[in-house]
């Protein structure tokens, strides 16, 4: 893992790129919500982490502690897959309803992502994020999972706890 992280850090064009543990990404809505929360914290100068990539991981992990965020949402030796995430350059409007996020924006940096995947001896998998119990356990979701809530809702509720 250390070699993979070192290679990734050397290859990534800037700190808008990060590696995220595969199981901790519940859905595109989950990832966009984490990004939006990170961006708001950045605008308000309320980020706990020193960089947007670390703040995003912290929010996904649902914690106030950056070290714990890397332990829970970062990649580990036992991981076989990870997400390469690029935090988009989108300016936010003060009103939530005035913001438009083109969900296809991730295709804008596909070539850079493929280059990094190849240099890290990885392979591209065509799969979207999916909420799992394993992912909730990994980010230390401690609330009861009630049948009336979807797994995605549990991930979103946990994400919100990072800013409480």
Language model: regions and residue ranges:
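Short, low-complexity, polar/charged sequence segments that are solvent-exposed and flexible
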Residues: 10-14, 38-40, 103-104
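Proteins with a high burden of low-complexity, intrinsically disordered sequence enriched in S/T/G/P/A and R
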Residues: 1, 29, 161-163
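Short, intrinsically disordered low-complexity segments
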Residues: 20-46, 128-145
